[in-house]
Amino acid sequence: MSKKIIDEVIDILEDKKYTYTMIEYPEHNRKSVDIVLNSKEPTLIRVSEDKITKEEISDLKKIAVSTLTASLVVTNEEEEDIVSVKADNVFAISPEGFKKVINGEKIFLYRTRGGIFIKIRNYILKHKREEMGYSIGDVAKFLGVSRKAIYDYEKGDSDVSLEVAEKLIDLFGDDIIGDVIWDSIKSKKEILEEGVAEFSPENFKAKLIYKLKESGLNALSLKLTAADLIVKDSDNNRYLVTIENKDYNKSMKKFYEAKKLASYTKSELVIIIRTSKMLKECEDLGYKTYEENDIHSLIDEIKGSNGRQG
């Protein structure tokens, strides 16, 4: 992690008196979450001076979509006023751009593989078009695009080039321009787990995912943070599941950091215990715990019956 960038991020948060917590697990390897910000919506922050990995992006996407919020990757690789969209709800931004976000300024330019676009507020576009009596054909002709493009703009399936945005502003005013981050949050998109390994006695995590999914629960695997799984029930209640490691001290650190992550993302923490010594320790600390051979009780708890409080 770049000390310089992390210091900039913390200075920005301290200056605006934001409440945040540092996630300090794993300690000596790459991790997907550095900071969780407690704003009007919890926000995940990953600080990186080099290229972020696919696994980091995958974790950030899963947590952000599951918790209906944004993941921000703060990096020097981005330009000040342009956001790079890495995945659903995952946005890369410069330290200067991050400061603008924290200050409540609108960031409306974003980059994808297809080029640079401007975020528009589709619901305002449709409302103003109808209010002013324009047909879809009228607007398409004025902008020099197809009728299908206007349908896509109004459904929120497509944003616009700089040239088209200028014409839209001329026609409807600048309040049609949106915010790349906060107007892009996807809340109901189902994330499909990619490549979950076949379970075996040695692969307890894969076995757990299989059993949870078999019971009709949505379970997503995390690889580079303190929680191992995100689980959601049919009522959209969220659980962060953390599995005991072989190393006692690392496990205790992992549980503590997972508790912070759960608290800031408004999720319930559940710990899977694999040794009797750790079971007593965790119960004494007030953690909700289940033994690894008691998965059915964990499933009952998440589905609303027969749980036990550790």
From Swiss-Prot:
Gene3D superfamilies: lambda repressor-like DNA-binding domains
Key words, A-Z: DNA-binding, Transcription, Transcription regulation
SUPFAM superfamilies named in the record: lambda repressor-like DNA-binding domains
DNA-binding region positions on the chain: 136-155
Residues annotated as domain HTH cro/C1-type: 125-180
One Pfam family named in its UniProt record: HTH_3
GO-annotated molecular function: DNA binding; DNA-binding transcription factor activity
Listed HAMAP family: HTH_type_cro_C1 (MF_00584)
Name of the protein described by the UniProt record: Putative HTH-type transcriptional regulatory protein SSO0942
Species of provenance: Saccharolobus solfataricus (strain ATCC 35092 / DSM 1617 / JCM 11322 / P2) (Sulfolobus solfataricus)
